[in-house]
Amino acid sequence: MAQSVSGYSVGIDLGTTYSCVGVWQNDRVEIIANDQGNRTTPSYVAFTDTERLIGDAAKNQVAMNAHNTVFDAKPLIGRKFSDPIVQADIKHWPFKLTSGWRQAQIVVQFKGESKTFQPEEISSMVLIKMREVAEAFIGKEVKNAVITVPAYFNDSQRQATKDAGAIAGLNVLRIINEPTAAAIAYGLDKKGGERNVLIFDLGGGTFDVSLLSIEEGIFEVKSTARDTHLGGEDFDNRLVDHFTQEFKRKHRKDITENQRALRRLRTACERAKRTLSSSAQAYIEIDSLFDGIDFNSTITRARFEDMCGDYFRKTMEPVAPVLRDAKLSKSQVHEVVLVGGSTRIPKVQQLLSDFFNGKEPNKSINPDEPVAYGATVQAAILSGNDSSQKLQDLLLLDVTPLSLGLETAGGVMTTLIARNTTVPTKKSQTFSTYADNQPGVLIQLFEGERSMTRDNNLLGKFNLDGIPPMPRGVPQIDVTFDIDANGIFNVSAVEKSTGKENKITITNDRVVCRRHDIDRMVSEAEKYKSEDEANKIRIEAKNGLENYSYNLRNTLNDEKLKDQIPEDDKKAIEDKVTETINWLDANQSAEKEEYEGKQKELEGIANPILQKMYAAAGAAGGMPGGMPGMPGGMPGMPGGMPGMPGGMPGGMPGGMPGGWPPCWSSDQGPKIEEVD
């Protein structure tokens, strides 16, 4: 059902390595190019002594500022610093990570200070960039968005993504799974009978496989499986390791000591990987890579396929379980749709084709764009734009990626909502006490497929107190699990005889204390937005003074004019121009008013002299050949704003250096047991 929303709505694919945004216009999806003309934007955020850069501008300067350029923030959401995946990736990240109470945190130097950010804060900055890309295209404010997440994202990661949207000033209409969004892109115009479609989504850092049935506008997810840490960046890492060893072998030098050299090599490896999707061989050429040594090498497609063979074979592992869960055979799959840039790799396509007995994958849609495309369609529907014939009767039925349950006596996982259950959904079950006269119960909530809770992921917990003294097994406690359309998980428990009730929205240990943190981040975003705007105006004033000074110098040196100005006047202007340029070089961070004051000083000397010259020329019949090199104009306009490439208002330095404080106590508490 459409929501009552104001303002424009967009669909955003918030990717690990690249992000993409679309809007519904003229009865179709428009995937929007950014200010560099690219339809995907790097999910990079860089911090310097003066500004924050996002997207292409951040990625372009990463070799020079590696320690303060953050990427891959998405997989960090909801992962602790001690997580094996985080520890395995640290060696590939030049930026610093530290351990927060809830998850790993990112530490950078920004404007001369050490700042700590949560991963969702970095994601919110990328979302701000995508919103601004859309606003530049539409010409109006964007207020609402549908944002996609990997199908394997757990409840807390989905909530954190929603939080990132809120910090970015967006009303998040819905969080939807990436493979489901891609299926919409494939099936929007498909009419006719039921079709079973396998979405094979291999991106930069995530991998999902989903099986959907599409029939007359109804998209129903039958099953989903994933590898939570597999993608194009793993292939890049193999190439980097290969060439690092080659450089060491040839030159007896270890480039892993130098982050700038490593970053330049990684960029070249990513380019080579892309080349190998269409060519049998790729060349690596990097001038002065390390200690003044030029590095040249080649890599063949066969060698690349061999070094990444285990990863490529790993992409096939989730496919069979997805078919099994959906109760379908290979022959019953009508289409295999490729999503994500890494599906361009020929070996991946070949393995997939071999698995489906020679059936070729569908390559009719650009693998970089279908996720944003599907999110845009969903945004159009949810914002009430369903008057379009194409959008009418379209229904999206997603599933929960993991089983949800609670701990009963003995640490047993009792499942209430099974994996691949269609959402939204609601399920209740009755439990009782484990001991006589037990005054309360501790309800611990888990997600996962293992029989014991210790092997699953703890989502949250809460107490239900005030149970009257009764023998064990007598109290009747109704526990209800409720998952909404965003996949957000709500749990309530009621003791029947007293009506005592308690409930929780599972947001990964973030019940009440989380809200004020989000509010603080939002207010910081507003604060730094105005600060960034002021910095933008300051740089415009600096550029205006610089352009005025150099234009004035060019005017004095112009062949047609230099003889028209008396030497004393010319020297007065030249001395003041030189003084101003020297002052500019020494005062790159001055205030707007200082730049404007310096420009007025320069104008005070130059304007009377130039006016006298032009007046004399006018009396003599005009300036020969016109008046080239007129200084001045509009300060801040000539040459654009070189100091702000891709920089975006709304930064949120500061973070939360100590991590979030705990909201509830230890694991100890009275147990609960299942009622037969």
Curated annotation (Swiss-Prot):
Belongs to the heat shock protein 70 family. The keyword Chaperone applies. The gene is HSP70. It comes from the Eukaryota. NCBIfam families: PRK00290.1. It comes from Bremia lactucae. One of its GO terms (molecular function) is ATP binding. The keyword Chaperone applies. This is Heat shock 70 kDa protein. Residues 657-676 are annotated as: Disordered. Keywords: ATP-binding, Chaperone, Nucleotide-binding, Stress response.
